[in-house]
């Protein structure tokens, strides 16, 4: 097994030492590495391994899980994550399973399910006049891709055209645009006023950021769709592409992006004894609904 723990977190580091010791006491081979391993070259770590681990245990928040999941995009390795030093922790199991060592018995007895989370793939194309179409870069994301201005000193209006399945759908004017998976609907998209989508629903959320038109609303589409994003700035300003909170590259006026679903989903282990998705929303978002749900969960 491989243990990836959140960098710059003493709590996560200590938890990784505890986890490593727990595994070795049961004669389970394991190794610890930081999430910022070798200057954020986590992908290269797996590429250079002689033998891949059977399981990756992630200790941190959702950001650490996203980084680990993106590094594993080409490998069929499940992820078991615990919320150690993170904030919301939508993608993680409760840390009690780790510290009371019950996670070992749960794994041995197979008292868990594999939760398949669909990912996003983005190809960035150069479409300069009189040049052959070519891919400049390719990226994968578990939560989302989004497009925002390159400018840091001012906040200009961006103009972004969107096509769905070869059909021009809209031109958004505003601060930017988010394309999220169902998993990512509780991340940046939710903060920008987008809908919460259950992770079992195979969908994309297209959500404009602070649009200048009241008619520009978030929409949910099947994740079998092909989404094309074009920069149509009249002022020659450039837009930056982001994935899962990390900068990718600058999208120039004649460039465009094709976004679709990744063939291989992310495998995440969910314990049978874990709280439900809806209880997670109540706890993480501090919903003030029927308090009996919280009371029943505590009994």
UniProtKB/Swiss-Prot annotation:
Location of the active site: 62 (proton acceptor)
SUPFAM superfamilies assigned: NAD kinase/diacylglycerol kinase-like
Broad class of enzyme this protein falls into: transferase
Any one annotated GO CC term: cytoplasm
Alphabetical UniProt keywords: ATP-binding, Cytoplasm, Kinase, NAD, NADP, Nucleotide-binding, Transferase
Main subcellular location: cytoplasm
Record protein name field: NAD kinase 1
Stored HAMAP family: NAD_kinase (MF_00361)
Cofactors that this protein relies on: a divalent metal cation
Cross-referenced Pfam families: NAD_kinase, NAD_kinase_C
Compartment(s): Cytoplasm
């Amino acid at each position: 097994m491989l243990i990836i723990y959140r960098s710059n977190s003493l709590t996560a580091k200590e938890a990784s030492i505890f986890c490593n010791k727990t595994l070795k006491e049961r004669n389970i081979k394991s190794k610890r590495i930081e999430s910022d391993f070798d200057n954020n070259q986590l992908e290269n770590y797996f590429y250079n391994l002689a033998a891949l681990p059977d399981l990756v245990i992630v200790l941190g928040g959702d950001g650490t899980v996203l980084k680990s999941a993106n590094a594993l995009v080409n490998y069929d390795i499940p992820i078991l994550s615990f919320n150690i030093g993170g904030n919301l922790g939508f993608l993680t199991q409760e840390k009690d399973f780790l510290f009371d060592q019950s996670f070992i018995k749960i794994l041995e007895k197979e008292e868990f399910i594999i939760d398949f989370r669909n990912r996003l793939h983005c190809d960035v194309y150069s479409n300069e006049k009189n040049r052959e179409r070519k891919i400049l870069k390719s990226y994968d994301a578990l939560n989302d891709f989004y497009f925002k201005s390159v400018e840091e000193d001012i906040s200009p209006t961006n103009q972004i055209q969107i096509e769905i399945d070869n059909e021009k759908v809209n031109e958004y004017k505003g601060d930017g645009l988010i394309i999220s998976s169902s998993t990512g609907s509780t991340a940046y998209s939710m903060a920008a006023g987008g809908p919460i989508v259950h992770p079992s629903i195979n969908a994309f959320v297209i959500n404009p950021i602070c649009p200048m038109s009241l008619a520009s609303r978030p929409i949910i589409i099947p994740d079998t769709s092909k989404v094309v994003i074009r920069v149509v700035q009249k002022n020659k300003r450039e837009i930056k592409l982001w994935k899962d909170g990390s900068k990718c590259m600058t999208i120039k006026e004649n460039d465009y992006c094709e976004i679709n679903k990744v063939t291989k989903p992310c495998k995440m282990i969910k314990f049978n004894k874990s709280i439900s998705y809806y209880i997670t929303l109540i706890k993480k978002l501090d919903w003030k609904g029927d308090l009996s749900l919280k009371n029943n969960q505590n009994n």
